[in-house]
Amino acid sequence: MATDEFSSSTTPSYDYYDYTNESGLPPCDETDWDLSYSLLPVFYMIVFVLGLSGNGVVIFTVWKAKPKRRSADTYIGNLALADLAFVVTLPLWATYTALGFHWPFGSALCKLSSYLVLLNMFASVFCLTCLSFDRYLAIVHSLSSAKLRSRSSILVSLAVIWLFSGLLALPSLILRDTRVEGNNTICDLDFSGVSSKENENFWIGGLSILTTVPGFLLPLLLMTIFYCFIGGKVTMHFQNLKKEEQKKKRLLKIIITLVVVFAICWLPFHILKTIHFLDLMGFLELSCSTQNIIVSLHPYATCLAYINSCLNPFLYAFFDLRFRSQCFFFFGFKKALQGHLSNTSSSLSAQTQKSEIHSLATKV
């Protein structure tokens, strides 16, 4: 496929932009997609298997722990739900790529799958932002934030997250469609119903800003501000942390890890998209070789973003003793949990171990 024909059809991308020659840019050399046809489907299926199983376990564990669920757990469960909604579309995109960007599934699935991809992106970053805000309230305003962290407030915030995410992703549902190009049917952005050819670049640019600003930059700025305040608070009281505050600090480390990994996974994608946007609008004048590099790197930057959807459950398992304990407890691995506790503190009596098992599986 030639570079000047490369469009948002080439990946299940978070997708409001286009690498086409309709921008008035000179035609460039061809880009060889043979490696992508073979490599990307395998990668998609690995993410699908890990994401489906890992996020499924998270959702089940959070659901089973309802009586003692932390406010953070509710956001974590919804983060897993957003990731799960995305990874179930990956077999379709794997098939699409393996067939040389040929979409055999019809217009409805083209629209729905693209919509779920964008819905995941927005819902994930908004859940992480709310997690960060929840930790900010719990640590910086622990005495005065009870009402804001109540169950009803959390449910309202989740409703706003999903509604706002659904609205921001809606252009993908409207604009994505199938079209025939040569021997292939591709799933692509179609602006013919809303714009003339001359104004398509403005739509692409506007939608690109829509994904980058509320979908990455603004949430990342808010999370950075929250953690600056949290860092100041924790530093001031580091020597006098009570047991409850130590638990908050452990949970804080987990959430910071989630945010950092999210930023690392998404940053290359947004950098490439921003460079393309600036080139498209005439703020940059990229050579053909540079355009080809951007085009070639884009599917792999998108894949790095996809990794985030299957990494989170493994981060919980690695960093959060409480989550591991809940998994052991709810899936019936009580002997394994007892062994884990025995290694941690061999002096515990049998009765204490039994109590600790239940405590780890249900409490903060």
UniProtKB/Swiss-Prot annotation:
GO terms for biological process: angiogenesis; apelin receptor signaling pathway; coronary vasculature development; G protein-coupled receptor signaling pathway; gastrulation; heart development; negative regulation of cAMP-mediated signaling; positive regulation of angiogenesis. It is a multi-pass membrane protein. Keywords: Angiogenesis, Cell membrane, Developmental protein, Differentiation, Disulfide bond, G-protein coupled receptor, Gastrulation, Glycoprotein, Membrane, Receptor, Transducer, Transmembrane, Transmembrane helix. InterPro entries: ATII_rcpt (IPR000248), CCR1-9-like (IPR050119), GPCR_Rhodpsn (IPR000276), GPCR_Rhodpsn_7TM (IPR017452). Residues 1-39, 100-112, 175-201, 272-298 are extracellular. It holds the Pfam family 7tm_1. The keyword Disulfide bond applies. One of its GO terms (molecular function) is mechanoreceptor activity. Residues 61-78, 134-153, 223-250, 320-364 are cytoplasmic. The chain crosses the membrane at residues 40-60, 79-99, 113-133, 154-174, 202-222, 251-271, 299-319. Glycans are attached at N21, N183. It comes from the Eukaryota. This is Apelin receptor. It comes from Xenopus tropicalis (Western clawed frog).
